[in-house]
Curated annotation (Swiss-Prot):
The modification Phosphoserine is found at S362. Homodimer; disulfide-linked. Interacts with REG3A. Changing R513C: In ISDNA; changed glycosaminoglycan synthesis; no localization to Golgi apparatus in patient fibroblasts. Glycosyltransferase which regulates the biosynthesis of heparan sulfate (HS). Initiates HS synthesis by transferring the first N-acetyl-alpha-D-glucosamine (alpha-GlcNAc) residue (GlcNAcT-I activity) to the tetrasaccharide linker (GlcA-Gal-Gal-Xyl-)Ser core linker. May also transfer alpha-GlcNAc residues during HS elongation (GlcNAcT-II activity). Lacks glucuronyl transferase II (GlcAT-II) activity. Important for both skeletal development and hematopoiesis, through the formation of HS proteoglycans (HSPGs). Ubiquitous. Expressed in keratinocytes. Expressed in pancreas. Pathway: Glycan metabolism; heparan sulfate biosynthesis. The gene is EXTL3. This is Exostosin-like 3. Glycans are attached at N290, N592, N790. Its cofactor is Mn(2+). Disulfide bonds join C177-C182, C188-C236, C400-C415, C831-C879. It is found in: Endoplasmic reticulum membrane; Golgi apparatus; Cell membrane; Nucleus. Changing N657S: In ISDNA; changed glycosaminoglycan synthesis. The active site is at D833. It comes from Homo sapiens.
Length: 919
């Protein structure tokens, strides 16, 4: 009981204690809450009260701690002294501050003067360097002039022959006539200009028998020829047209011979005469057979061996297009390479070889004698076997569906009309031409007709019979355009044709197109070729190609050229010596006579042909490097005198592989005077600049009060006859340099960019070198070409709004390129730059060269260019596809690189400098 009672009491005591603790905690919480409430309520009220009375307290403080009314404190002596000291110090501080500002202003002015002096010193150093370079160049030029032992060549001065001939000893037989014994060279001095006198056929009896179409075509081309003269006394060559005759008129040989010998300038033997017998039909007879032509040359399409004199007479082409120019739109494209038929032949043999020979011989006897065997039967059997094998699709027909055309004996007669034959040849990769079996025939009119019809439509001629004498064979490399196969190899012809690669086949097709267009397509080309052939044989240079006479617009110059704020700093490097007056023109006509002696094969077998003498070409030979140090250094400016070097030595001389030269800026403009003036000012101080030719394309003259900038070189403002973009590429006579920088009036180019482009062009003179690149893209859905200006890793064009090219291409663009292209440029007022790229790539088979990273040009303040218009691009698409039709193929080629200077992004030692700072 006791333990239990105690337990109960103990438990009761602990419970009371717990209750007390709970009550105490509650009291504390209550006081804490009350305290917080009082603080939160009364503290903001108190703060609000004091804040509202703050202004009154400030006023009271001012009254307590501030200066007393009446300067009560200043009545004390030491306080007054302190006040005076404070005022004195304040005044001194103000004076010192004014002096400090004045000194700072003077220091700033002196710093500006120092900077100006430094700049003047740098400019003086640059001027001194320029003067040293000019002095060095002048001394070098003087030494070259004193040491020069070669006469300076220029346009030949005409030396004309005397009226009377000295006479030539006659050869034993006219059959042995060659130039050295039947041609009077004394009437044709090298500088005579090759004057040609053309007889008027109507004044002679045979003139009334001439085919009117042939006579009209011949007279028209003779009147327009640059060599033709009306003064027979000074003529080097005399030309007479005797055929083709009208049907059925046949002039007897004796009668024709009598009329020839009665020509007023025949001089007993006809030396320096050429008798032309043009044929329009395949059956044109050999009019001059059995006619004694004396020492006169004969030019016709049909020759017998007994009358043909190699190296003296001329095999000419038939007159296919008598009066009309060929239509480029009707000529099939050169691509695809392979056409429907591998080869075709249509013809019919009217008279066999055996029946034409006066004495019948066996096949074996013919093989042993001079005349070749009659392989016609073997040829027919072989070609039919190829056709029956069906390995390739070929078409051979040895009988005509209709009446065959008249032809010479042993010759394969033509089938059908010309239009029908051309349609078949358009489907043929190769065109077989079987030469006549008559060994007496050197060439026949029918065989020549087959040859030129094949060339016209791009069927590669395959001539069976190596004995044939093709037209102008002395000059033309026919192996580049045709296959000449001996008749005994007829069984191997199929294998030979299948073995040709696409690239070889296209090269032959393109060369054949060039030969046809240049020498055989029109009456003009035939007559010009006959004269060019004789002129080349006697080594007389061609007539100089004409230049466009520049009609200058008078203008006032004198405004000092300003500094372009957009011009990037060229650094410490000079860009080259600024040439002193007078400007240095490129040498002209240095190869007047060597071209006709050493380079006539290239001129005859490459565009544009041998008809013009150019002042200079981009294909002139280059001397080896050591020649400039061993006697042939005239005009060369090697880097460091030959020792080479980095930036400073590089900028002091042009170097390179050709002598020194300058360039001409040609700038086309149209009613943008302010933009033009700004562009001209940016050319101030440009090294190696010879002249600026501004092509004023506007019908309105420049403003009378317009003051042109003085940029240190002449500015020639040329007025044009009409507003045409083709004027950009006219070969103006004011352009006296080989290098032309064609630039738009709104193009911004730094001097270092121009100089780098010029140096690159000097190493690639036959190509366009410039800045903005474009390319041609294949439109897969429409199977055509597109003009594309997007950024690309391939390009095929460099726009001529900022590009260097050779003046040679200006001649070709204006006088040689098909007129249809220039007409389209005028129609769209667009595409002239594309046309120039087509031309250069067609001539060289090379792409252009892009320099620097520029892709477009910005022109702040210029009106919006036409190139931003959608129609501009649509027109350029059309231009590209039209140009392809005219050329017959796409001449543009792709390139995947651009050119930068040699030391660009190269780490150099401290004593070396870069070629260009930014390029």
């Amino acid at each position: 009981m006791t333990g239990y009672t105690m337990l109960r009491n103990g438990g009761a005591g602990n419970g009371g204690q717990t209750c007390m603790l709970r009550w105490s905690n509650r009291i504390r919480l209550t006081w804490l809450s009350f305290t917080l409430f009082v603080i939160l309520v009364f503290f903001p009220l108190i703060a609000h009260y004091y804040l509202t009375t703050l202004d009154e307290a400030d006023e009271a403080g001012k009254r307590i701690f501030g200066p007393r009314v009446g300067n009560e404190l200043c009545e004390v002596k030491h306080v007054l002294d302190l006040c005076r000291i404070r005022e004195s110090v304040s005044e001194e501080l103000l004076q010192l501050e004014a002096k400090r500002q004045e000194l700072n202003s003077e220091i700033a002015k002196l710093n500006l003067k120092i900077e100006a002096c430094k700049k003047s010193i740098e400019n003086a150093k640059q001027d001194l360097l320029q003067l040293k370079n000019v002095i060095s160049q002048t001394e070098h030029s003087y030494k070259e002039l004193m040491a020069q032992n070669q006469p300076k060549l220029s346009l030949p001065i005409r030396l004309l022959p005397e009226k009377d001939d000295a006479g030539l000893p006659p050869p034993k037989a006219t059959r042995g006539c060659r130039l050295h014994n039947c041609f009077d060279y004394s009437r044709c001095p090298l500088t005579s200009g090759f004057p040609v006198y053309v007889y008027d056929s109507d004044q002679f009896v045979f003139g009334s028998y001439l085919d009117p179409l042939v006579k009209q075509a011949f007279q028209a081309t003779a009147r327009a020829n640059v060599y033709v003269t009306e003064n027979a006394d000074i003529a080097c060559l005399y030309v007479i047209l005797v055929g083709e005759m009208q049907e059925p008129v046949v002039l007897r040989p004796a009668e024709l011979e009598k009329q020839l010998y009665s020509l007023p300038h025949w001089r007993t033997d006809g030396h320096n005469h050429v008798i032309i017998n043009l044929s329009r039909k395949s059956d044109t007879q050999n009019l001059l057979y059995n006619v004694s032509t004396g020492r006169a040359m004969v030019a016709q399409s049909t020759f017998y061996t007994v009358q043909y004199r190699p190296g003296f007479d001329l095999v000419v082409s038939p007159l296919v297009h008598a009066m009309s120019e060929p239509n480029f739109m009707e000529i099939p494209p050169q691509v695809p390479v392979k056409r429907k038929y591998l080869f075709t032949f249509q013809g019919e043999k009217i008279e066999s070889l055996r029946s034409s020979l006066q004495e019948a011989r066996s096949f074996e006897e013919e093989m042993e004698g001079d005349p070749p065997a009659d392989y016609d039967d073997r040829i027919i059997a072989t070609l039919k076997a190829v056709q029956d094998s069906k390995l390739d699709q070929v078409l051979v027909e040895f009988t005509c569906k209709n009446q065959p055309k008249p032809s010479l004996p042993t010759e394969w007669a033509l089938c059908g009309e010309r239009e029908d034959r051309l349609e078949l040849l358009k489907l043929s990769t190769f065109a077989l031409i079987i030469t006549p079996g008559d060994p007496r025939l050197v060439i026949s009119s029918g065989c020549a007709t087959r040859l030129f019809e094949a060339l016209e439509v791009g069927a590669v001629p395959v001539v069976l019979g190596e004995q044939v004498q093709l037209p102008y064979q002395d000059m033309l490399q026919w192996n580049e355009a045709a296959l000449v196969v001996p008749k005994p190899r007829v069984t191997e012809v199929h294998f030979l044709l299948r073995s040709l690669s696409d690239s070889d086949l296209l090269a032959m097709r393109r060369q054949g197109r060039f030969l046809w267009e240049t020498y055989f397509s029109t009456a003009d080309s035939i007559f010009n070729t006959v004269l060019a052939m004789i002129r080349t044989r006697i080594q007389i240079p061609a007539a100089p190609i004409r230049e466009e006479a520049a009609a200058e617009i008078p203008h006032r110059s004198g405004k000092a050229a300003g500094t372009d704020p957009n011009m990037a700093d060229n650094g410490d490097l000079d860009l080259g010596p600024v040439e002193t007056e007078p400007p240095y023109a490129s040498p002209r006509y240095l190869r007047n006579f060597t071209l006709t002696v050493t380079d006539f094969y290239r001129s005859w077998n490459c565009a544009p042909g041998p008809f013009h003498l150019f002042p200079h070409t981009p294909f002139d030979p280059v001397l080896p490097s050591e020649a400039k140090f061993l006697g042939s250094g005239t005009g060369f400016r090697p880097i460091g005198g030959g020792a080479g070097g980095s930036g400073k030595e590089f900028q002091a001389a042009l170097g390179g592989n050709v002598p020194r030269e300058q360039f001409t800026v040609v700038m086309l403009t149209y009613e943008r005077e302010e933009v033009l003036m700004n562009s001209l000012e940016r050319l101030n101080g440009l090294p190696y600049l010879n002249k600026v030719v501004v092509v004023w394309n506007s019908p309105k003259l420049p403003s009378e009060d317009l003051l042109w900038p003085d940029i240190g070189v002449p500015i020639m403002v040329v007025r044009t006859e009409k507003n045409s973009l083709n004027n950009r590429f006219l070969p103006w006579n004011e352009i006296e340099t080989e290098a032309i920088l064609s630039i738009d009036d709104d193009a911004h180019l730094r001097h270092d960019e121009i100089m780098f482009g010029f140096r690159v062009w000097r190493e690639a003179r036959d190509r366009i070198v410039g800045f903005p690149g474009r390319y041609h893209a294949w439109d897969i859905p429409h199977q055509s070409w597109l003009y594309n200006s997007n950024y690309s890793c391939e390009l095929s064009m460099v726009l001529t709004g900022a590009a260097f090219f050779h003046k040679y291409y200006a001649y070709l663009y204006s006088y040689v390129m098909p007129q249809a292209i220039r007409d389209m440029v005028d129609e769209y007022i667009n595409c002239e730059d594309i046309a120039m790229n087509f031309l250069v790539s067609h001539i060289t088979r090379k792409p252009p060269i892009k320099v620097t990273s520029r892709w477009t040009f910005r022109c702040p303040g210029c009106p919006q260019a036409l190139s931003h218009d959608d129609s501009h691009f649509h027109e350029r698409h059309k231009c590209i596809n039209f140009f392809v039709k005219v050329y017959g193929y796409m001449p543009l080629l792709y390139t995947q690189f651009r050119v930068d200077s040699v030391l660009f992004k190269t780490r150099l030692p401290h004593d070396k400098t870069k070629c260009f700072k930014f390029i």
